[in-house]
Amino acid sequence: MTEQPLSSWNTPARVGVELVELRRDDGHPIDALWYPADEPRVGVLHVHGKGSSVLTGPSRFLPPLLPEIAHLAVNMRCHDLAYTVGTDDWAVDGGMWEDLSTGHLDLAAGVAHLRERGVEQVVVSGHSSGGFYAADLMPRDAGIAAWVLLSPLTTNKNPFPLWWPDPEDRDRAAALARAMVAEGRGRDLIPVSGWFHAISAASLVQRLEEPDGIWLDNVGHAAAPVLMGWGDTEPRHALWNDLFRQFAGGSDRRLVLAGADHYYRGQERDLAAAIAGFLADAIG
């Protein structure tokens, strides 16, 4: 790996990776990028956020900046917003069709692959919505060596006030989505204002029915040290501070990068160095 030239993520522009296809327990295929290390005792599973992929955010820039450990960046089934899989036009996945109830299967497939590669200490690092899915895995796998939650999403209900500022419009959309699911049209799309642009009826119903406080409840099951990091320019700065105080134990760490935004532009190396220090303390 050379230090020059740099990519737009302030990392080396050329890094050797291997494309691998994983299989979830239910048979669905998952694409991932494997970044090898000379001695893969420690391996990090990178989980991206909504509308992202292995080519964006921490999943993209952290592996080249931490070459001493192995990395596996997985494309969640909700990667990007919409894409066709297989050869059938109707076989569509992506963020608009996100299935909140099965995302943990994507992570489990990645963890299993790391263990098959001989990785002894598996670390799960989730950014944004990936931090929600990482927390969802915590009650399901007590064998994870450490957790890294970067600007984590803590509820999937966040967009509601943006999509429907008028509560009555929100109620009408909720009723429509539930009716569509009852009619077997859960994969049909409902337009929304702003980004996502549209969401499937079934995915909207899942968001509506998400239990309050589920993220914090899940993080309470973590059986290994947790690093929770974010930038102090993010609007959820105060929320994350409060949540960290509620769950943190003696081995958990908080990282607040001054001036950093949601994607840590310009501070990629600072973030990587902080994660390396945390892992050195947490697992040696």
Language-model-derived ranges and their functions:
Residues 2-37:
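N-terminal cap/lid segment of alpha/beta-hydrolase-fold proteins
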Residues 5-9, 16, 95-104, 143-276:
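The alpha/beta-hydrolase serine catalytic core
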Residues 75-86, 153, 260-261:
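Short beta-to-alpha linker loops that shape the active-site pocket of alpha/beta-hydrolase fold enzymes
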Residues 80-119:
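Catalytic nucleophile-loop/oxyanion-hole region of alpha/beta-hydrolase
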Residues 124-126, 150:
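Short beta-strand immediately N-terminal to the catalytic nucleophile in serine-hydrolase-like folds
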Residues 126-130, 134:
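Gly/Ala-rich beta-loop-alpha elbow adjacent to hydrolase catalytic centers
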